[in-house]
Amino acid sequence: MIKKEMIAMLLAGGQGSRLGVLTSKVAKPAVAFGGKYRIIDFPLSNCINSGIDTVGVLTQYQPLRLNTHIGIGIPWDLDRNVGGVSVLPPYEKSQNSEWYTGTANAIYQNLEYMEQYHPEYVLILSGDHIYKMDYKIMLDYHKANNADITIAAMPVPMEEASRFGVVVTDNDNKITEFEEKPEHPKSNLASMGIYIFSWKVLKDALIKLKDQQECDFGKHVIPYCFNNNKRIFAYEYNGYWKDVGTLSSYWEANMELIDIIPIFNLYEEFWKIYTKTDTIPPQYIAKDAYIEKSIIGDGTEVYGRVFNSVIGSGVVIEEGCVIRDSIIMNNSHIGKNTTITKSIIAEDVTIGENVELGVGEEAENVKFPKIYNSGLVTVGEWSVIPDNVKVGKNTAISGETTLQDYPNGELPGGGIIIKAGDN
């Protein structure tokens, strides 16, 4: 009989709609990050660094890039005969076939997968957070408290607490109150969406709540267990943790990597972040190029000037270009004499010559002000921007655009271009 002390279930099926055009063709956990990685690399690396060798990755929205990236788990040493990594999409059953309708529903639909390992504990993770955590220490804490559930939590500014599940604890860190995104939070200790369940407690709750519409851990499972007097503890985490679910937080997390002393260090030998790497040549920096305080990916060619930016692999930045405070993802091409300021350029984008991105004053986005609201220019995958155009702040572009899409050669601040077939 196969028996694992703890297995991990990694929720990676989310669309990430608050990232706008960045996730129109790819799931949020598969979005590129830090010039080399994808967001899902961080929880996967945490698992293997914590000694967890059995991970189920639950996918749904736009799964192809994610499936290809994970493969059989070789970069994370998760290509195992017993355990390893398994990609778990919704699958057709003999009856009641359905998509995953909530975080807990997704786990419920994979009870059989978990059962085969006879785990003592199950670790529930989100695939869209940037952080380093030793889950073994959290498990030791769970055991020491004889807990049924342990929730990783961290202090946040009180004004931001209403965005999270909030916990109130006693002097022993036992949770006495739990509220999911309360309007008037009683505490600033926020759930990180990382849970350790004793297996029997998790299984019982999922079965009892199987008919709950859009069953979710924060909204349903935790309150159910709390109301049934389960021992629920908060594991307080004080390291770096970033939910990169908005354009501003995604941009900030990338920019934090290039600080002189980064608060999130990718270069630590004792806690490596693993990823799938392609066989590509080294970067090339031309004689007249200039780079200051930036990350430059493998295979990238720089002929222009780059300041305070994160550049992925296989990017070409032509002569006369000036890139500032921006993220340019893999395999994008920036034409000659183009200026890019505070922008996020997704993968495989082509930008013409003499283009200016991020000019003028900020204006509220005309269509999606809650998404495009941090002064950024956001360009989706496979987009094309023609020569000689100017693009203002709080804008979004997706698709193969032509000069006709830019009246007077300009997309003013707050504007948006989404071509047919892109959303």
Curated annotation (Swiss-Prot):
<comment type="pathway">
    <text>Glycan biosynthesis; glycogen biosynthesis.</text>
</comment>
<keyword id="KW-0547">Nucleotide-binding</keyword>
<dbReference type="InterPro" id="IPR011004">
    <property type="entry name" value="Trimer_LpxA-like_sf"/>
</dbReference>
<keyword id="KW-0119">Carbohydrate metabolism</keyword>
<keyword id="KW-0067">ATP-binding</keyword>
<dbReference type="InterPro" id="IPR023049">
    <property type="entry name" value="GlgC_bac"/>
</dbReference>
<feature type="binding site">
    <location>
        <position position="191"/>
    </location>
    <ligand>
        <name>alpha-D-glucose 1-phosphate</name>
    </ligand>
</feature>
<dbReference type="InterPro" id="IPR005835">
    <property type="entry name" value="NTP_transferase_dom"/>
</dbReference>
<dbReference type="GO" id="GO:0005978">
    <property type="term" value="P:glycogen biosynthetic process"/>
</dbReference>
<dbReference type="InterPro" id="IPR011831">
    <property type="entry name" value="ADP-Glc_PPase"/>
</dbReference>
<keyword id="KW-0321">Glycogen metabolism</keyword>
<feature type="binding site">
    <location>
        <position position="100"/>
    </location>
    <ligand>
        <name>alpha-D-glucose 1-phosphate</name>
    </ligand>
</feature>
<dbReference type="Pfam" id="PF00483">
    <property type="entry name" value="NTP_transferase"/>
</dbReference>
<feature type="binding site">
    <location>
        <position position="165"/>
    </location>
    <ligand>
        <name>alpha-D-glucose 1-phosphate</name>
    </ligand>
</feature>
<dbReference type="InterPro" id="IPR005836">
    <property type="entry name" value="ADP_Glu_pyroP_CS"/>
</dbReference>
<feature type="binding site">
    <location>
        <begin position="180"/>
        <end position="181"/>
    </location>
    <ligand>
        <name>alpha-D-glucose 1-phosphate</name>
    </ligand>
</feature>
<comment type="similarity">
    <text>Belongs to the bacterial/plant glucose-1-phosphate adenylyltransferase family.</text>
</comment>
<keyword id="KW-0548">Nucleotidyltransferase</keyword>
<dbReference type="Pfam" id="PF24894">
    <property type="entry name" value="Hexapep_GlmU"/>
</dbReference>
<dbReference type="GO" id="GO:0005524">
    <property type="term" value="F:ATP binding"/>
</dbReference>
<keyword id="KW-0808">Transferase</keyword>
<dbReference type="GO" id="GO:0008878">
    <property type="term" value="F:glucose-1-phosphate adenylyltransferase activity"/>
</dbReference>
<comment type="subunit">
    <text>Homotetramer.</text>
</comment>
<dbReference type="InterPro" id="IPR029044">
    <property type="entry name" value="Nucleotide-diphossugar_trans"/>
</dbReference>
<keyword id="KW-0320">Glycogen biosynthesis</keyword>
<dbReference type="InterPro" id="IPR056818">
    <property type="entry name" value="GlmU/GlgC-like_hexapep"/>
</dbReference>
<protein>
    <recommendedName>
        <fullName>Glucose-1-phosphate adenylyltransferase</fullName>
        <ecNumber>2.7.7.27</ecNumber>
    </recommendedName>
</protein>
<comment type="function">
    <text>Involved in the biosynthesis of ADP-glucose, a building block required for the elongation reactions to produce glycogen. Catalyzes the reaction between ATP and alpha-D-glucose 1-phosphate (G1P) to produce pyrophosphate and ADP-Glc.</text>
</comment>
